Curated annotation (Swiss-Prot):
[2Fe-2S]-bridged holo-homodimer. Interacts in vitro with SUFE1, BOLA1, BOLA2 and BOLA4. Interacts in vivo only with BOLA4. This is Monothiol glutaredoxin-S15, mitochondrial. [2Fe-2S] cluster binds at residue 91. Belongs to the glutaredoxin family. CGFS subfamily. InterPro entries: Glutaredoxin, GRX_PICOT-like, Monothiol_GRX-rel, Thioredoxin-like_sf. It comes from Arabidopsis thaliana (Mouse-ear cress). One of its GO terms (cellular component) is cytosol. Its main location: mitochondrion. The keyword Ribosomal protein does not apply. One of its GO terms (molecular function) is 2 iron, 2 sulfur cluster binding.
Amino acid sequence: MAASLSSRLIKGIANLKAVRSSRLTSASVYQNGMMRFSSTVPSDSDTHDDFKPTQKVPPDSTDSLKDIVENDVKDNPVMIYMKGVPESPQCGFSSLAVRVLQQYNVPISSRNILEDQELKNAVKSFSHWPTFPQIFIKGEFIGGSDIILNMHKEGELEQKLKDVSGNQD
């Protein structure tokens, strides 16, 4: 009886894809019937500060978010705005973009857009591009993971990154 009940519970849970409410956002990724990743992000006032997203830019900062994005793009030969960080991407598209860029042994600067919704909106406004990741090379907006992958396959990315310091190819 217990095995049957737990089996039905597991099957029911496995069929859940995503839940959204005003208090909670949750998503799970399944592969071959097995849960590979699950996340829950509380978004209510009762959430302890340790579990709330952090804001990297102090609210009283004299730099506007637009200035921060402009400086990021200008000061970093390879800049990626992504979900997560290069060492731990939080979505498949961000992971793909990082893996492609890492093939060229170039220093990758990044910002985690999951940590600051206002920064995320500022980046969208700056690039006029709605999705993430967003990759800039030598100050030029390139696009997302699909564009980087296509450039890699066509040999264009190697040319674009040819004189970026740290490139050992």
